[in-house]
Each structure stands twice: as structure tokens, then as C-alpha cells.
């Protein structure tokens, strides 16, 4: 599952609108829409805040 799909699925699982998720994480609704649309360039600090508000985490793994 890609990041955009995971964020949208978790937000919906929590019964939150994009505006609700934005307010919980301190970002704009436009930012939430951009993440869920898979936009290539988003600010990492804002992304981490959004993920945290949704109970998700960003992980980095070694390539194999």
C-alpha cells in the first residue's frame, strides 16, 4: 500500500474528513488533499505531523 492510500484509508477508518485530519495535525486541508493525491513534493515535518495525528508512522528501511 502506498503512502497516499494508507493515509486516506486510515483517515476514513477514523471517520475523519480531510478538514478534521488537517485540524488535528496542524496542517491545511489542501496539504491533506495533496498527500492523499500522492503529490511528489510535500514537507516532511508536516507529513510526520499528519501521520502522527492519524496514528501512523513513517519508517525507513534498507534496500535489499
Regions found by a protein language model. Give the residues of each.
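Conserved hydrophobic/aromatic packing and binding residues within compact polymer-binding modules
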Residues: 7, 21-22, 32-35
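Residue-level signal for the short linker/turn that defines the boundary of a DNA-recognition helix
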Residues: 5, 15-16, 42
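Recognition helix of helix-turn-helix/homeodomain-like DNA-binding domains
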Residues: 26-40
Amino acid at each position: 500500500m502506498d503512502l497516499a492510500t494508507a493515509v486516506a484509508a486510515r483517515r476514513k477508518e477514523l471517520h475523519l474528513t480531510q478538514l478534521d485530519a488537517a485540524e488535528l495535525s496542524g496542517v491545511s486541508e489542501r496539504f491533506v488533499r495533496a498527500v492523499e493525491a500522492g503529490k511528489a513534493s510535500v514537507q516532511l515535518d508536516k507529513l510526520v505531523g499528519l501521520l502522527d495525528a492519524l496514528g501512523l508512522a513513517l519508517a525507513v528501511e534498507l534496500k535489499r
